[in-house]
Amino acid sequence: MRTFVHGGGRLPEGIDAALAHYRHQVFVGRLGWQLPMADGTFERDQYDRDDTVYVVARDEGGTICGCARLLPTTRPYLLKDVFASLLMHGMPPPESPEVWELSRFAARSGAPCPRSGRADWAVRPMLASVVQCAAQRGARRLIGATFVSMVRLFRRIGVRAHRAGPVRCIGGRPVVACWIDIDASTCAALGIPSASAAPGPVLQ
């Protein structure tokens, strides 16, 4: 698995369609999400815009095998606009250059899995690139809506992940707003020596 960062809402020719197709496969096809702007092949929404930062993973053959979307909370973002009910009662959605939203996160390994078959085999390197990318843009925390099972997985990896509100059932699965602290503990767990100084993933 190799990760690539694409900033400013810019995706190279061919990657835009491939990423939208991969997101449709994962979030609509596999997870069964009812997304209003998804058609029969592609998944995009109003948060794919000029300030969106994408982290895209590709396997040895160049096929997309992971994705993530980062948005600054100083502009409209998914959790604030759609899932604010997931936040703790009375907690305003964050609006800070030091907090970025993580959404559309998915990963599968581009290499054979170890015998253990552990899910973090693919998630850990993908999340490492996401955290590194966000930190290089001034983020100290990430926030986003995710499955409770994903929060447990982040914690098992060693990431400082914790709930930002109550668990709610959405689409038949428990979902929660989740903080990820970009601190020394998280960086060490992800193999990032320093969140601000570590070499970043390939930029395009």
From Swiss-Prot:
GO molecular function, one term: N-acyl homoserine lactone synthase activity
EC number(s) from the headed UniProt entry: 2.3.1.184
BP term (GO), one: signal transduction
Origin superkingdom: Bacteria
InterPro entries: Acyl_CoA_acyltransferase, Autoind_synth_CS, Autoind_synthase
Catalytic activity as recorded in UniProt: a fatty acyl-[ACP] + S-adenosyl-L-methionine = an N-acyl-L-homoserine lactone + S-methyl-5'-thioadenosine + holo-[ACP] + H(+)
The keyword S-adenosyl-L-methionine appears for this protein: yes
Keyword annotations from UniProtKB, A to Z: Autoinducer synthesis, Quorum sensing, S-adenosyl-L-methionine, Transferase
PANTHER family recorded: ACYL-HOMOSERINE-LACTONE SYNTHASE, ISOVALERYL-HOMOSERINE LACTONE SYNTHASE
Protein function: Required for the synthesis of acyl-HSL autoinducers that bind to SolR.
Family: Belongs to the autoinducer synthase family.
Name of the molecule in the record: Acyl-homoserine-lactone synthase
Gene name of the encoded protein: solI
